[in-house]
């Protein structure tokens, strides 16, 4: 029987219990709306990915395409102008918007351009993924900082990864106290956050301490096991993944998480299906399981030759295994 190990952190104590997979799946399933024949385009999620630079074009594509495979209706990519042609060529399904330049612009110009081009689109989004392939151009980072604040004002669920986490480590106030925000650090990124927040990186509960220091944002600490915590509750995902750790798998995870996170942000936390835990924690758990199953399936096919597109090809089926689609039949 599959299970997710769950830890409730209270003061100096740690209380552990096992939750059956059926309980976890029921919680995740509650975040996946049924499909109906009278639904409208966009009802199942409009996801924005803010990232992509001249050097890095694959990461935002993986995240946006994974969001579509996980059930979102629309995916936008807001990227540097030098990245847009490549990303457009990867998929005709993505809405790719070149929003800022880094060449021949000073930092102030790059910041202003990013703000002016992206801000009008924020109101269309249910969830924004910030960081895949973003790069560290100073003007762009300043623009993204302002956009993160604008997303908070509009209550847009936000997932921060990669260079977005570099930005958070530099300015933790960007996410402090945001209950609709998820950080998805790998080990090095978690260590950087811990150092910035004066948390011992070697502590067993480093992810939980980071989450608490940031005002109970949700942290998904990726590793051999994924630790999902808001500083109070902890879910540990030890679903088998793949021994091949290729670049891009974290982007696939962020994309798969986005539609679930958008639903979690407006879910009723009092719903009994969530067994007293925040819906956003269950959204992260479901995405972690799905991304690990996708990686395992890709590795089974390709073995050492496995790369991120192989996992991307499996993410739709993996999401279906976590939360099967239900369809509301039209009235006869």
Describe each PLM feature range.
Residues 1-159, 166-182, 187, 191-332:
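Small-residue (G/A/S/T)-rich helix-start motifs and N-terminal tracts that mark the onset
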